[in-house]
């Protein structure tokens, strides 16, 4: 049986996550009291109507504070039943959450006449502390639109063919912000930039003209070898420490050329020695 617990601050994308999971065969329960988590898992295990039990629940700040405090104990109880249980935590920066609430005009679950929206958002972080500390996967949705979030959720949650550590190698552009959910970040802005070649500017690191240009640059090859040597040595140690997810981010200025090229190459070579290696290009449209 597989269970995914979805949590996060209000406005971060929890409803979208449940929709994606439901569309892919998960039985979903929204706003489950954390104290009922073990009982729900037990009932799902003995339910003969579920050919392959796939269960997703959202637990967030709408819970009683006392239930959230007990979340670590509830999670241990579920996992003691030999259930593969992953905790997904979604978040976004405060300015983005404020903007989303302003656009939808929805009321924050913690807001009151005496508590501003900004205060409610900050208080929510404190309440969810026990879940944040135990999250297996954290996804920051600040720079993701609805479709990008759905794609990211499918990639990280549904393309994990077997238990073990799932590695995501992600290209990005610093001009749109660094991925705050990355575990390792490599800055490759010091490398020759195809953007300044007019004939290459409109191509990406996935296309042959850019590949041909970067593949003959000595600094690019040296950077690739150094990053690969580091990852090849240390990623197995991450896997041995029972990490469920590890995100490696490779960043250049715009996220179209150098980081894309290196991310693709690293993904190809690491897939030969590691299981569950995924590649994503955040800023390629």
Swiss-Prot record:
Record's keyword terms, sorted: ATP-binding, GTP-binding, Nucleotide-binding
NCBIfam families: PRK05416.1
Amino-acid positions noted as binding GTP in the UniProt annotation, renumbered to this chain: 60-63
GO MF annotations in UniProt: ATP binding; GTP binding
Pfam families, per the entry: PapZ_C, RapZ-like_N
SUPFAM superfamilies for the chain: P-loop containing nucleoside triphosphate hydrolases
Binding sites annotated in the UniProt record for ATP: 8-15
Similarity field: Belongs to the RapZ-like family.
The name this protein goes by in its record: Nucleotide-binding protein PSPPH_4154
InterPro entries listed in its UniProt record: P-loop_NTPase, RapZ-like, RapZ-like_N, RapZ_C
Family matches, as PANTHER family: RNASE ADAPTER PROTEIN RAPZ
Keyword GTP-binding in annotation: yes
UniProt organism field: Pseudomonas savastanoi pv. phaseolicola (strain 1448A / Race 6) (Pseudomonas syringae pv. phaseolicola (strain 1448A / Race 6))
Function description: Displays ATPase and GTPase activities.
């Amino acid at each position: 049986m597989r269970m995914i617990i979805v949590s996060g601050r209000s406005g971060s994308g929890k409803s979208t996550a449940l929709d994606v999971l439901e569309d892919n065969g998960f039985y979903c329960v929204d706003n489950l009291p954390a104290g009922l988590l073990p009982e729900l898992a037990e009932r799902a295990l003995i339910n003969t109507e579920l050919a392959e039990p796939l269960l997703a629940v959202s637990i967030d700040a709408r819970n009683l504070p006392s239930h959230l405090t007990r979340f670590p104990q509830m999670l241990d109880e579920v996992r003691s039943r030999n259930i593969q249980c992953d905790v997904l935590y979604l978040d976004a920066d405060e300015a983005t959450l404020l903007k989303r609430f302003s656009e939808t005009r929805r009321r924050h679950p913690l807001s009151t006449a005496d508590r501003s929206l900004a205060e409610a958002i900050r208080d929510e972080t404190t309440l969810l502390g026990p879940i944040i500390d135990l999250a297996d996967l954290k996804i920051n949705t600040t720079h993701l639109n609805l479709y990008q979030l759905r794609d990211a959720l499918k990639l990280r949650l549904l393309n994990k063919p077997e238990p073990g550590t799932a590695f995501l190698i992600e290209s990005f552009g610093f001009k749109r912000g660094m991925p705050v959910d990355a575990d390792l970040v490599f800055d490759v802005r010091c490398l020759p930039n195809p953007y300044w070649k007019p004939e290459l500017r409109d191509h990406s690191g996935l296309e042959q003209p850019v590949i041909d240009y970067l593949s003959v640059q000595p600094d690019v090859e040296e950077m690739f070898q150094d990053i690969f040597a580091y990852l090849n040595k240390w990623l197995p140690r991450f896997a041995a420490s029972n990490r469920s997810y590890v995100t490696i981010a490779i960043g250049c200025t715009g996220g179209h050329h150098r980081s894309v090229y290196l991310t693709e190459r690293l993904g190809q070579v690491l897939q030969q020695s590691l299981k569950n290696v995924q590649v994503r290009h955040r800023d390629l449209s």
